[in-house]
Regions:
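Conserved ABC ATPase signature
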Residues: 130-137
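Catalytic Walker B motif of ABC-type/P-loop ATPase nucleotide-binding domains
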Residues: 155-159
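Conserved ABC transporter NBD signature motif
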Residues: 61-76
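Conserved ABC ATPase "signature" region
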Residues: 98, 102-105, 109-126
Length: 239
């Protein structure tokens, strides 16, 4: 990417007692780029996301946005959509956006943008649907609409494909490609290299909380000398 990094992570570290969950992790994400955080279960992906979003305090490292180090309260800069997206069960899709508008003191006229976002994300017909009646895919979209309405520049999605049927996965891919054109910095976590290959401009591979490799899929393939995606992943994460 030609643009300067929007999000920069340097030396991120997090422990739980004697267990090292993330150890000296560094990577960057540019505006309009999708980066995949790839690794087996227990690699430290979710811990990294929780630390980036401010839900966990790392013991080491810095997180910067546009060259400025972020403090612990960074919810207006980095939004996390967890593996199991949670919405308010008794609020409608539209009421979620009303809540965002009020809590962020958005300027008058936000309703037009909110309506356009719902249509863009395929939620136009779900405007009055209660949160408890939404599928996982619809909950994801509701949270994404909220982050876009608040104009949060960095979007983290933890294992976003899990639990989605093939149509839902296809819709999510199309939505992420569309979001990339808006200049958002997007990071997804996954343990499946095929998904990372399909979705991501670059891939950052972790194992046991440590950085293993990073690059485009083609760069990683050339480095390892493996054509098959699964063989490539196994080779890079081999003990």
């Amino acid at each position: 990417m030609d643009s300067a990094p929007l999000l920069q992570i340097d030396g991120l570290g997090k422990r739980f007692g004697a267990k090292v969950a993330v150890d000296g992790l560094s990577f960057s994400v540019a505006a309009g780029e999708i980066v995949g955080l790839l690794g087996p279960n227990g690699a430290g992906k979710s811990t990294t996301f929780l630390a980036l979003a401010g839900f966990l305090r790392p013991e080491a490292g810095t997180i910067s946005w546009n060259g400025v180090a972020l403090g612990h309260d960074r919810g207006r800069t980095i939004a996390l959509i967890p593996e199991t997206p949670e919405v308010y069960p008794l609020l409608t899709v539209w009421e979620h956006l009303v809540f965002v508008a009020k809590s962020n003191a958005l300027a008058p006229g936000w309703e037009k943008k909110a309506g356009e976002l719902l249509e863009r994300l395929g939620l136009g017909g779900e405007r009055d649907t209660l949160g408890r009646a939404l599928s996982k895919g619809m909950r994801q979209k509701t949270l994404i609409a909220a982050t876009l309405l608040a104009d949060t520049p960095v979007l983290l999605l933890d294992e976003p494909m899990i639990g989605l049927d093939p149509q839902g996965q296809r819709e999510l891919r199309e939505m992420l490609f569309d979001l990339r054109t808006t200049g958002k910095a997007i990071v997804i976590s996954t343990h499946m290299i095929e998904q990372a290959q399909q979705l991501c401009d670059r891939i950052v591979i972790l194992k046991d909380g440590r950085f293993v490799a990073a690059g485009t899929f083609d760069e990683l393939r050339e480095r390892v000398g493996r054509e098959d995606a699964e063989e490539l992943f196994l080779e890079l994460t081999r003990a």
